[in-house]
Amino acid sequence: MRVGVLTGGGDCPGLNAVIRAVVRKGIEVHGWDFVGFRNGWNGPLTGDSRPLGLNDVEDILTRGGTILRSSRTNPYKVEGGVDKIKQVLADQGVDALIAIGGEDTLGVAKRLTDDGIGVVGVPKTIDNDLGATDYTFGFDTAVSIATEAIDRLHTTAESHHRALVVEVMGRHAGWIALHSGLAGGASVILVPERHFNVDQVVSWVERRFEKEFAPIIVVAEGALPEGGEEKLLTGEKDAFGHVRLGGIGTWLADEIAHRTGKESRAVVLGHVQRGGTPTAYDRVLATRFGLNAVDAVADGDFGVMVALKGTDIVRVKLSEATAELKTVPVERYQEAEVFFG
């Protein structure tokens, strides 16, 4: 059997650990051949590929990013895209695909399965917002990076007695903001799931100043003020219809400065949350996902995604994997509110 592997969507720490586990088990246990398709779905669309052997994955466990590179290519936006993929797979003798990605990549995987291509999905997103799995790799690393940044920002904020607004990733789900804010001792945490009242935020900030402390406000990029709109870096959309969010941190810092008369600055962590070495947790989770994806291919169980349920790796239908996002529930946010102000 010959199996194709690809990584789609935004990169995150742990992708290489999945690739390594897939190739190691596929070759050493089953004797399969592997081909890596470059740049997400663009690889099987155009035939851009490379062989994947044991030597190719020998030293990639701890590396961030992906040796296969990635893109946000949507083959269903390309005329004749599905037929092109089928032809490339036939030409290269590929019997099945393992697609590693988030909601968009897995949504394509589901549609390709419906169109007769054997695909197994592996969930990937630093946002941790896929509803069919308890956790996705990359999330723990992103939270660790954001928490370290918050820890460092506390000292500079206190030295100058200023407010610092830390903008983290999170388009529709505020898991990174919630976890890093709690771990980093933030004075306020703002998430997309709950539109915030600016007056209330200012009140929490002023209360912190009154206690002679410098407030740290952690805000997800998709957070919204009541009656407000998303802050966009650009109105352009990618192949899946997503706009680039950004700017809520700067906007909020300006509002705080204007309303309190106190110096306030914004810090946008941006893509640093995606980069670098994955944590031990993410390496292990990514490895387990890869091993179990190989099992699904061996069983001929296509149209599924491997997922974490409790401490077990299970399989769920791709239709279930992309059905809904996992957002921060009210009770989890209320836990964090105890520490506001």
Curated annotation (Swiss-Prot):
<dbReference type="InterPro" id="IPR015912">
    <property type="entry name" value="Phosphofructokinase_CS"/>
</dbReference>
<feature type="active site" description="Proton acceptor">
    <location>
        <position position="127"/>
    </location>
</feature>
<dbReference type="GO" id="GO:0005945">
    <property type="term" value="C:6-phosphofructokinase complex"/>
</dbReference>
<feature type="binding site" description="in other chain">
    <location>
        <begin position="271"/>
        <end position="274"/>
    </location>
    <ligand>
        <name>substrate</name>
    </ligand>
</feature>
<feature type="binding site">
    <location>
        <position position="162"/>
    </location>
    <ligand>
        <name>substrate</name>
    </ligand>
</feature>
<feature type="binding site">
    <location>
        <position position="10"/>
    </location>
    <ligand>
        <name>diphosphate</name>
    </ligand>
</feature>
<dbReference type="GO" id="GO:0030388">
    <property type="term" value="P:fructose 1,6-bisphosphate metabolic process"/>
</dbReference>
<feature type="binding site" description="in other chain">
    <location>
        <begin position="125"/>
        <end position="127"/>
    </location>
    <ligand>
        <name>substrate</name>
    </ligand>
</feature>
<dbReference type="GO" id="GO:0042802">
    <property type="term" value="F:identical protein binding"/>
</dbReference>
<keyword id="KW-0808">Transferase</keyword>
<dbReference type="InterPro" id="IPR000023">
    <property type="entry name" value="Phosphofructokinase_dom"/>
</dbReference>
<dbReference type="InterPro" id="IPR012003">
    <property type="entry name" value="ATP_PFK_prok-type"/>
</dbReference>
<comment type="function">
    <text>Catalyzes the phosphorylation of D-fructose 6-phosphate, the first committing step of glycolysis. Uses inorganic phosphate (PPi) as phosphoryl donor instead of ATP like common ATP-dependent phosphofructokinases (ATP-PFKs), which renders the reaction reversible, and can thus function both in glycolysis and gluconeogenesis. Consistently, PPi-PFK can replace the enzymes of both the forward (ATP-PFK) and reverse (fructose-bisphosphatase (FBPase)) reactions.</text>
</comment>
<keyword id="KW-0460">Magnesium</keyword>
<dbReference type="GO" id="GO:0016208">
    <property type="term" value="F:AMP binding"/>
</dbReference>
<feature type="site" description="Important for catalytic activity; stabilizes the transition state when the phosphoryl donor is PPi">
    <location>
        <position position="124"/>
    </location>
</feature>
<comment type="pathway">
    <text>Carbohydrate degradation; glycolysis; D-glyceraldehyde 3-phosphate and glycerone phosphate from D-glucose: step 3/4.</text>
</comment>
<dbReference type="Pfam" id="PF00365">
    <property type="entry name" value="PFK"/>
</dbReference>
<dbReference type="InterPro" id="IPR035966">
    <property type="entry name" value="PKF_sf"/>
</dbReference>
<feature type="binding site" description="in other chain">
    <location>
        <begin position="169"/>
        <end position="171"/>
    </location>
    <ligand>
        <name>substrate</name>
    </ligand>
</feature>
<dbReference type="GO" id="GO:0070095">
    <property type="term" value="F:fructose-6-phosphate binding"/>
</dbReference>
<keyword id="KW-0418">Kinase</keyword>
<dbReference type="GO" id="GO:0006002">
    <property type="term" value="P:fructose 6-phosphate metabolic process"/>
</dbReference>
<dbReference type="InterPro" id="IPR022953">
    <property type="entry name" value="ATP_PFK"/>
</dbReference>
<dbReference type="GO" id="GO:0005524">
    <property type="term" value="F:ATP binding"/>
</dbReference>
<protein>
    <recommendedName>
        <fullName>Pyrophosphate--fructose 6-phosphate 1-phosphotransferase</fullName>
        <ecNumber>2.7.1.90</ecNumber>
    </recommendedName>
</protein>
<dbReference type="GO" id="GO:0047334">
    <property type="term" value="F:diphosphate-fructose-6-phosphate 1-phosphotransferase activity"/>
</dbReference>
<keyword id="KW-0963">Cytoplasm</keyword>
<dbReference type="GO" id="GO:0003872">
    <property type="term" value="F:6-phosphofructokinase activity"/>
</dbReference>
<feature type="binding site">
    <location>
        <position position="103"/>
    </location>
    <ligand>
        <name>Mg(2+)</name>
    </ligand>
</feature>
<keyword id="KW-0479">Metal-binding</keyword>
<feature type="site" description="Important for catalytic activity and substrate specificity; stabilizes the transition state when the phosphoryl donor is PPi; prevents ATP from binding by mimicking the alpha-phosphate group of ATP">
    <location>
        <position position="104"/>
    </location>
</feature>
<keyword id="KW-0324">Glycolysis</keyword>
<dbReference type="GO" id="GO:0048029">
    <property type="term" value="F:monosaccharide binding"/>
</dbReference>
<dbReference type="GO" id="GO:0046872">
    <property type="term" value="F:metal ion binding"/>
</dbReference>
<feature type="binding site">
    <location>
        <position position="265"/>
    </location>
    <ligand>
        <name>substrate</name>
    </ligand>
</feature>
<dbReference type="GO" id="GO:0061621">
    <property type="term" value="P:canonical glycolysis"/>
</dbReference>
<comment type="subunit">
    <text>Homodimer or homotetramer.</text>
</comment>
<comment type="similarity">
    <text>Belongs to the phosphofructokinase type A (PFKA) family. Mixed-substrate PFK group III subfamily.</text>
</comment>
<dbReference type="InterPro" id="IPR012829">
    <property type="entry name" value="Phosphofructokinase_III"/>
</dbReference>
<feature type="binding site" description="in other chain">
    <location>
        <position position="221"/>
    </location>
    <ligand>
        <name>substrate</name>
    </ligand>
</feature>
